[in-house]
Regions:
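Non-catalytic accessory regions of SAM-dependent methyltransferases
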Residues: 1-59
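Short amphipathic alpha-helical segments
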Residues: 11-18, 70, 74-78
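A short coil-to-beta-strand element that immediately follows conserved catalytic motifs
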Residues: 36-38, 91-94, 212-213
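A short interface-forming secondary-structure element
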Residues: 59-72
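Rossmann-like S-adenosyl-L-methionine
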Residues: 113-278
Length: 278
């Protein structure tokens, strides 16, 4: 059985079948949601039978990330399989720059296949548009696993004053606006992320610019700011990055998570909502 599996792995058709199965499954999930299949997590590692491989689909652009030495050796077959399932004109980006690759003895690199120099693309999710820097944004570009959480925020945001902390590209905040939030404050330490939020607001939410505040600052520093503490919010969203990189970090980082939740709770009105995601 082991020899048969190894033989299959050396065959492009093995990867074609896995990708086709994953695509078919997602087509069923998004059957009644226009355009959602064009922007989704196409391959989610072992969940789709391909451990060590993540592929995010941005219409005709496929952002891939390999994290294991075993999967790395099949990179060329992955490219061939994607072209076979879709077409030869697709663009493929390998974002193989995660530090975890070093644990497998792998180099860190990025590679573009049939991709032009235009980094900014328009992503569609839950019927909304977002600008994404496909080559330079975190991980594979977008956190598709938060799709339902983004929509949940929209469903409860009506007439609420919202704080979107660790906002990244604004997935939660712009959904809050789509849900008719009274006001949304975006906060992120990354100047690049803040710039993209601003460009997304200008491009797709110009009619709601008076409801938008954008702050480029470290979230914990802002929450401790005396002037900022004069404000209160109906809904506070905390979606921090993965602070814990290894077991030795657990103790100190857990303190940061607890402090973050306590600080954020100060800003909630009575009967306000604090939504923490990690």
């Amino acid at each position: 059985a082991r020899k048969r599996i190894l033989k299959e792995l050396k065959d492009k058709e093995f990867f074609v079948k896995k990708i086709e199965n994953a695509l078919s499954f997602r087509e069923k999930i998004f059957a009644n949601q226009e355009n959602e299949i064009d922007f989704c997590r196409l391959i989610h590692s072992e969940g789709d039978g391909l451990p060590g491989l993540v592929i995010d689909r941005f219409k005709n652009i496929f952002s891939c990330q390999i994290t294991t030495a075993g999967m790395e050796q099949f990179k060329s077959l992955i490219v061939e399989a994607l072209k076979s399932v879709f077409n030869n004109d697709i663009s493929i980006i390998f974002r193989n720059d995660l530090q975890i690759r070093k644990l497998e003895g792998l180099e860190l690199y990025s590679e573009n296949i049939n991709f032009d120099n235009q980094n900014l693309i328009t992503l569609q999710e839950n019927g909304l548009n977002f600008l994404v820097d496909i080559k330079n944004s975190q991980k594979t570009g977008w956190f598709f696993d938060q799709r339902k959480n983004h929509y949940f925020v929209r469903s409860i945001a009506n007439n609420l004053k919202v704080l979107d902390a660790f906002s990244y590209l604004g997935g939660f905040g712009f959904n809050a606006l789509a849900g008719n939030a009274k006001e949304v404050t975006f906060v992120d330490i990354s100047a690049t992320a803040i710039d993209l939020i601003s460009k997304t607001a200008d491009s797709f939410y110009f009619d709601k610019k008076d409801k938008i505040k954008i702050i480029n600052k470290k979230v914990f520093d802002l929450l401790e700011d005396e002037e900022f503490q004069k404000q209160s919010f109906d809904l506070v969203i905390l979606d921090p990055p993965a602070f814990i990189k290894s077991k030795k970090d657990i103790s100190s980082i857990l303190k940061s998570y607890v402090i973050g939740c306590l600080l954020a709770s100060i800003y909630c009105f009575t009967n306000g909502v604090l939504k923490y995601l990690e």
